[in-house]
């Protein structure tokens, strides 16, 4: 049985999807982009600012589901420019400090709202 996870501490869905779904002890998030949940506005700073906001949104969503960064088993990071890989890693490492999750990082041509990155995760409760 699946449970829909939703929180105002992460951006509302901008399409027909859930912020996250829990099935048993597993949590599957949708991609989080750097939208400031309180205002609905985009974080328009550099890649580091956008990464902080997007990953912060992801962690807020996981917390709502009874999870945390420590319980993430896999992330996928979509970035518009692979030249930003090192900067994203620098921010990513502030959220995932030990026993980092498995991760894929994919360069894409375009992302929703023309942001620089999007991050999704699979975690346990």
Positions of PLM-derived features:
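Short, polar/acidic, helix-capping and beta-turn segments at strand->helix junctions
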Residues: 2-125
